[in-house]
Amino acid sequence: MRVSLSLTSRCRINFIRERILENSSNSTTETQVKRALKSRHVSMIALGGTIGTGLFLTSGDVIHTAGPFGALTAYVLIGAMVYFLMTSLGEMATYLPTSGSFSDYGTRYVDPAFGFALGWNYWLNWAITVAVDLTAVALCIKFWLPDVPSWIFSLIALIIVFSINALSVKTFGETEYWLSAIKITVVVLFLIIGFLSIFGIMGGHIDVAKNLSVGNHGFVGGLGSFTTGGGILGVLLVAGFSFQGTELLGITAGEAENPEKSIPKAMNSIFWRILVFYILSIFVMAAIIPFTDPHLVGGNSAAQSPFTIVFERVGFSIAASIMNAVVLTSVVSAANSGMYASTRMLYSLAKDGGAPKIFSKTSKNGIPFIALLATTAVALLTFLTSIYGVSFFTLLVSASGLTGFIAWIGIAISHFRFRRAYVAQGKDVKKLPYHAKLFPFGPILALIMTVLVTLGQDPMLLFGKTWVQGVVMYAAIPLFFILYLGYKFKNKTKLIPLKDVDLSRHKD
């Protein structure tokens, strides 16, 4: 094992050295990414990017906490919020497709300080999330190989993810396409088997009516509250986490071959498929598994996944191993997407002067290679979990908890300003290549809901023995304002008047 690991390390060092040399010889004149993502890549990245551990593992906790219909209500509410956010992002992304996405939009349509803070917030979010996912990869593989040190699996996963992102954006898109296809296939298979079980064709008799109505007619804890973690409000956070990653669609617009066609196509079809997948999956779980079933609680492994429970009840004895492989696919996909998103955000910040210019350099394949190395350096935090164990892993998860919601808030504010500026400058809204739904109601509702969910992230963590975890989680909020105010005072920026907003369609 020591010899093979040494060989792997040497190969990685040689690979990195070659890429750095290649980058140095080509990047002096290259500062552009390449539009190589096809429509099918964009659609599948948007679809598969949100189907992951949130659905496969934590959905059981949501059903147990809020009840069958409470869980469905929570996912519908969050789904509606995300729908409005993504149509807002879709309108801006088709008008100005850029790798900086909402960071660029915040800079152009709100205030350069706002875009600066959004960009660094999002880069940090995904860079840390990559470290979390690499740790999760090790946990998945230890399901089969419990005696092998975890850091070896994390290292192998890091090398794979780094290599995919270092080759070309087309390689990234193709990899995500097939990883997403695996997840979608499992969900479709789950729904087919689930409904066959509900109708009594497989798995024997199931008392669906009882499972769905027990305990306050399917609502446990009623409306609930953010602080107690019960009821519908108490699970909105978990439901929100499940949908995080949908905003990746905006970042892929910067490298899509034909964003004016591929982005609207993805927006018009993908969101509803995601929502249907989630709602139908939650319904099947709740119909087959009583919310009082202890197996639904604390689902942090494939063996406790609601998918595993359903598969086992219809006779799939190796369901746990199958679902562990699927979860492994999900976390590798998440790490891959996270590496891509954070690299492109750092690249975009550098292009706009918000980060050192060296991060804007690209290889001949259009890869922001120095930005990729910087993101990989942060991802190395995963190896500290081998030293400090579960406690450090928990802190990493907490650190990335709020940043995704802050990005959503930024999308809503940026779009509201974009549309108002568009009208203020006498432009015809009908000529926009894509229209967000129900403006201004949509972004305003999404903004209010996102702020409520963000501020309601289990504030009780700040008290008692969990105060460190609470402080780390809520640190994202003051960090955002430090970045925002620091840039604002240094560069004397102000809220851009609507008639002075830059509505040109050429970014680079």
Swiss-Prot record:
- Kindly state which keywords UniProt assigns to this record, in alphabetical order: Amino-acid transport, Cell membrane, Membrane, Transmembrane, Transmembrane helix, Transport
What is any Pfam family matched here? Answer: AA_permease
Where in or outside the cell it occurs: the entry states: Cell membrane
**UniProt cross-references to Gene3D superfamilies, sorted A to Z:** Amino acid/polyamine transporter I
Q: How does it sit in the membrane?
A: Multi-pass membrane protein
What this protein catalyses is: L-lysine(out) + H(+)(out) = L-lysine(in) + H(+)(in)
- A GO term from the CC aspect: plasma membrane
Task: Give the protein family.
Answer: Belongs to the amino acid-polyamine-organocation (APC) superfamily. Amino acid transporter (AAT) (TC 2.A.3.1) family.
User: Could you tell me what this protein is called?
Assistant: Lysine-specific permease LysP
Name its species. Answer: Lactococcus lactis subsp. cremoris (strain MG1363)
Q: Which gene encodes it?
A: lysP
